[in-house]
C-alpha cells in the first residue's frame, strides 16, 4: 500500500514595497537546493484593466481591490493539491496583465510573496508559515526608487508622486496591520541571517515530517 503524497509547504512572505521580501524568499530557496522550490508572486495576479495607459497609471496598485485574489486562492489551492496551474503574467511597464500564461507545476516548497498575501483569511489558511519582513520606511522608499527606475522604466517624479499618493497610505492602512498574522517578523529583511536560519530550520522540520 503506497502512502499518500504530502501536500507542498506554502510559506507566505509579506511586507511593504521594498522591504526585502524577494531577498528573503531567495535566501529561503537557496537553502533548499535538494528540494523543489517555487516562487508564486502576488504581483502576477493584478487584475486585467481595459482603460488607457494613462488611466492604468492612476490605479491604486497597493489596495486589495487591485488584485484578483480569488484566482490567486484558486491556483494556490490547486498547487497545494498537487495540480499544475496556468499562472498569469503581469507587465509592469504597461501596467497590465498580458495575454500570456506560464505553466507551473507544484513543488515541495511554495513561497507565496506579495504586499497583501496575509490580508485575506482564505489565503492565510493555505499557509504553513507566515512571514512579515519589517524594514524602515525610508530604506523601503530608496529601494523602490532604485528598482522602479532601473527595471520598470519609471521617472523619479512619478515614483515619488505614487509613493505619497497611494504607496505610503496603503501601507499603513492595509499592509502593516497584517503583521499581527505573522508567525515570524523579520527585521532588516534578507540581511537578518539569524531570522533566516530560524525560518529555514522550521521549514526543514516540516519537510522531515512529510518525508
From Swiss-Prot:
It comes from Latilactobacillus sakei subsp. sakei (strain 23K). NCBIfam families: PRK05480.1, udk. ATP binds at residues 15-22. One of its GO terms (biological process) is CTP salvage. Its main location: cytoplasm. It catalyses: uridine + ATP = UMP + ADP + H(+); cytidine + ATP = CMP + ADP + H(+). It comes from the Bacteria. Pfam families: PRK. GO terms for molecular function: ATP binding; cytidine kinase activity; uridine kinase activity. GO terms for cellular component: cytoplasm. Pathway: Pyrimidine metabolism; CTP biosynthesis via salvage pathway; CTP from cytidine: step 1/3; Pyrimidine metabolism; UMP biosynthesis via salvage pathway; UMP from uridine: step 1/1. Belongs to the uridine kinase family. This is Uridine kinase. Keywords: ATP-binding, Cytoplasm, Kinase, Nucleotide-binding, Transferase. Its EC number is 2.7.1.48. It is found in: Cytoplasm.
Amino acid at each position: 500500500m503506497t502512502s499518500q503524497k504530502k501536500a507542498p509547504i506554502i510559506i507566505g512572505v509579506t511586507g511593504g514595497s521594498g522591504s526585502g521580501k524577494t531577498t528573503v524568499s531567495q535566501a529561503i530557496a537557496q537553502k533548499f537546493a535538494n528540494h523543489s522550490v517555487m516562487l508564486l508572486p502576488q504581483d502576477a495576479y493584478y487584475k486585467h484593466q481595459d482603460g488607457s495607459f494613462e488611466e492604468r497609471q492612476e490605479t491604486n496598485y497597493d489596495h486589495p481591490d487591485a488584485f484578483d485574489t480569488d484566482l490567486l486562492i484558486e491556483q494556490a489551492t490547486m498547487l497545494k493539491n498537487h495540480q499544475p496551474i496556468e499562472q498569469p503574467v503581469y507587465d509592469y511597464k504597461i501596467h497590465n496583465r498580458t495575454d500570456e500564461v506560464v505553466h507551473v507545476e507544484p513543488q515541495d516548497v511554495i513561497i507565496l510573496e506579495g504586499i497583501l498575501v496575509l490580508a485575506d483569511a482564505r489565503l492565510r489558511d493555505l499557509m504553513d508559515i507566515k512571514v512579515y519582513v519589517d524594514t524602515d520606511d525610508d530604506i523601503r522608499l530608496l529601494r523602490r526608487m532604485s528598482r522602479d527606475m532601473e527595471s520598470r522604466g519609471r521617472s523619479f517624479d512619478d515614483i515619488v508622486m505614487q509613493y505619497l499618493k497611494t504607496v505610503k497610505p496603503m501601507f499603513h492602512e492595509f499592509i502593516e496591520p497584517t503583521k499581527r498574522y505573522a508567525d515570524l517578523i523579520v527585521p532588516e529583511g534578507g540581511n537578518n541571517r539569524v531570522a533566516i536560519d530560524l525560518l529555514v530550520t522550521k521549514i526543514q522540520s516540516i519537510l522531515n515530517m512529510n518525508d
